[in-house]
Every structure is written in C-alpha cells, then in structure tokens.
C-alpha cells in the first residue's frame, strides 16, 4: 500500500475525545481496570492518519500569515464538482448548487427549518442516528420512526408500507434519509431509493438526505446519490456531504449541501446566514481542496480495502465465537450495529452488564440504545487490524465467553 494503515497512532492529549473522554467524571464510558488501555470504538472518527495532501494544503495556507475575511475560492467548488463526477457519476453539478454548512447536522437543521415549523412531524428510519434525535428532537421537531426490517438474508430493508402509513397518519411533509445508513451500514440499492422517492413524491414529502458516509462504501457495493434517481428526486432533496467522515476531519468542521431546486437553495442560504455563526473557515476550505486531490482518491481506495478487511474479520469472529450475538454485515461506513439480545436472554444479563464488562477491559463501544437498538452496541472498526483483533480477543475472554 502507498499509505500507512497499520501503525498505531497515539492520540492522547491531542484533542481526541475518542481516547480522552472515556473515564472522565460523568461520562457513560467508564475507565478500564488496571492493566487495560482504551481501544476507542465509540465515536465515529478514525484512528488513521489522514492523506498527506490535507496537512500540506493547510500548512501552505498558514505560511501566509494573514487570515482575514475571505470568499470561497473557485478551486473549492471545482474540487467538489470533480469529486462527485469522478466518484458518483454526477453530471450537471455547478457551483450555484453548492452551499456551506458548519457540519452536516447544521445543514439538516437548516433544511428542516426551511421545510417545517417547530412541532411538525419528520419521518426518520429506525434504528436512528442519535445526531438526528438530538439536533431535531431537542429543538421541537417530532421524529416519527419507521423501523427498518431484517430480511431472510439478514439485510436491513425499508418497510415502504409502514413508511406510507406513518406519512399519512402523521401528516408528514419532510423526511430525513440516511444514505448510507448509520448505524446499520446499509448501502441502498437504486430500486430502493427510487421506491422511497416515488412514495415521497406521492405525498409531497421533501427529503433531507444525509450522505456524509457516501465515500465509505465497502468492496462490492456502490453509492447511489439520492438526487440521481429521478428529476423529481433531484428537485425535492437537500443532500448533505462532507469530507470529514472520509478523511477524518471532523475537528476542522466543514460540510456542504447540494441543492438543485433554486427556490429551496435560496431559502437554505438565507436560513444558514441567519445564525451569523455558520461562516466557512479558511483552513477547512483548504482541507477540502487537499482532500479531493487525486492522492485523496488513492488513499480512499486503500482505506476502503482496509475497512472491508476489518469488517470481514469482525463479522466472521462474531459468528464463530459469540453465540447469541448477531450483526447484519455492513455494506458501507465503518460501524457495526451489534445485537446482543439473544446472548443477554440466555445468560440473564442486561445491556448495562454487557457495556460495563466491555468498559472494564477498555473496549470502548457505544450504547446502541441511543440509536433505538433495544439491546445493541455500535462498534467503530476504523483502526489498524491489530487493534481490532485485540478488542475482539478481550471481548472473547472477558465479556461473551468469560
């Protein structure tokens, strides 16, 4: 490989909540017992160094020691347009369709504010990304959950009949669509997106499509942009993207929307501006330009190979060694949504017991109940394989087969 995905990074005391927050007073993930270090498997960032073109772009810009007011450079828009054309086959994207937001959730909230009034019902799929729950629910929107169903092959599927029932009964005119899905890792097929968008068209539902994970597709699968499935989908969808998940840039904060509907785009721009806190950071602009270079594509291809290997290892290990623990193998993202229901029932344990045992040995997973998983945990696999192997060895010895 051209890039290093095997060395262990020491992120302690370097502004990484993934490793520094566990064990702090009041935080749900407690400190491990003596003899164990923390393996960060909860928050969705990576324990890999990013592609070198990003720090190079930032360093080059910081060498010019004036950081005053600025407007986004043409290179910024050109990089986004080129990336979507080369990676997703998108044609016709222009700079006028691209808007800035301080984080994808900020863009989701802005779009909801444009399309809804506080107190309105918004459709989401369950399991539900906890960020939607807080960003929308905490400011007065009512989230209506349509549960995803596992088919006979163990693949998460949308329940279109339930979606329509919920839309009609709750007078819904806005839906949040997560593609790929977090936490389940589903990469939706074209026919699934088409059917969902036809349903939304039928009932005049606008769509906010969170596609921040769209670059992190595992081998054998392909991301289909929501706006690409029909002309109507193109015009009724606000799509949110960012280089942050792809290139481990969450701390730099810099996301963007793609909106083709000029009526909707104008209102999005106004809503974003009204906060007076949503201006682009000059260094995040250069980070995106650095990320979306050809080197970024090579780095991403290698990362996807590593993540595919990690997912294969983890899912195989669970199937062979953890009786009563199940997982639907993700097709994208680097997260597992692990179901411990049968194991807990057989052993007379609760999810609290499982999490406490994990934390005792430093396996810092995330409580899946925050995502509407009754007896689940969400597990981050974006670390060197040796670290993933160590985590599963601890789970084997001290948690599920203790």
Give the label of every model feature segment.
Residues 2-103, 110, 294, 402:
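N-terminal small-domain helix-loop-helix segment of the aminotransferase-like
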Residues 67-199, 215-219, 223-228, 232, ...:
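Conserved core of the PLP fold type I
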Residues 211-213, 242-243:
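Short strand-turn motif at the edge of the Rossmann-like AdoMet-binding core
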Residues 233, 346-350, 356-366, 370-402:
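PLP-dependent enzyme catalytic core of the Aspartate aminotransferase-like
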Residues 236-320, 326-330:
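PLP-dependent aminotransferase class I/II
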Residues 307-308, 321-360, 377, 385:
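Conserved PLP-binding catalytic core of the aspartate aminotransferase-like
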């Amino acid at each position: 490989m051209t890039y290093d995905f095997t060395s262990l990074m020491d992120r302690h005391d370097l502004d990484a909540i993934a490793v520094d927050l566990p064990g702090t007073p009041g935080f749900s993930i407690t400190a491990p017992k003596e003899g164990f270090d923390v393996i960060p498997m909860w928050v969705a960032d990576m324990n890999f160094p990013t592609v070198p073109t990003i720090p190079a772009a930032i360093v080059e810009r910081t060498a010019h020691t004036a950081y005053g007011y600025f407007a986004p450079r043409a290179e910024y828009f050109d990089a986004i347009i080129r990336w979507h054309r080369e990676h997703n086959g998108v044609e016709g994207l222009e700079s006028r369709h691209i808007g800035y937001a301080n984080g994808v959730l900020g863009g989701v909230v802005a779009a909801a504010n444009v399309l809804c009034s506080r107190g309105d019902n918004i459709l989401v799929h369950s399991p539900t990304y906890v960020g939607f729950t807080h960003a929308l629910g905490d400011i007065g929107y009512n989230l209506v959950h349509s549960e995803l169903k596992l088919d006979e092959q163990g693949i998460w599927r949308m329940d279109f009949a339930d979606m329509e029932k919920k839309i009609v009964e709750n007078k819904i005119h806005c839906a949040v669509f997560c593609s790929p899905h977090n936490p389940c890792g589903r990469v939706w097929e074209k026919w699934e997106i088409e059917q969902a968008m036809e349903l939304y068209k039928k009932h005049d539902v606008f769509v906010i499509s969170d596609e921040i994970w769209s670059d992190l597709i595992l081998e054998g699968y392909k991301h289909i942009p929501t706006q690409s499935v029909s002309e109507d989908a193109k015009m009724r969808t606000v799509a949110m993207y960012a280089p942050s998940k792809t290139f481990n840039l969450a701390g730099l904060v810099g996301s963007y929307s793609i909106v083709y509907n000029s009526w909707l785009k104008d209102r999005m721009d106004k809503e974003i501006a009204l906060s007076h806190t949503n201006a682009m950071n000059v260094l995040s602009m250069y980070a995106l330009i650095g990320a979306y270079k050809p080197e970024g594509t090579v780095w991403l291809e290698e990362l996807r190979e590593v993540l595919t290997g990690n997912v294969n290892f983890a899912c195989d290990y669970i199937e062979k060694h953890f009786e009563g623990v199940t997982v639907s193998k993700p097709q994208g993202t680097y997260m597992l949504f692990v179901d411990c229901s049968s194991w807990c029932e057989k052993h007379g344990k609760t999810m609290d017991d499982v999490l406490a045992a994990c934390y005792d040995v430093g396996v810092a997973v995330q409580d899946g109940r925050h995502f509407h998983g009754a007896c689940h945990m969400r597990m981050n696999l974006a670390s060197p394989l040796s670290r993933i192997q160590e985590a599963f060895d601890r789970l084997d010895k001290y948690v599920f087969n203790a």
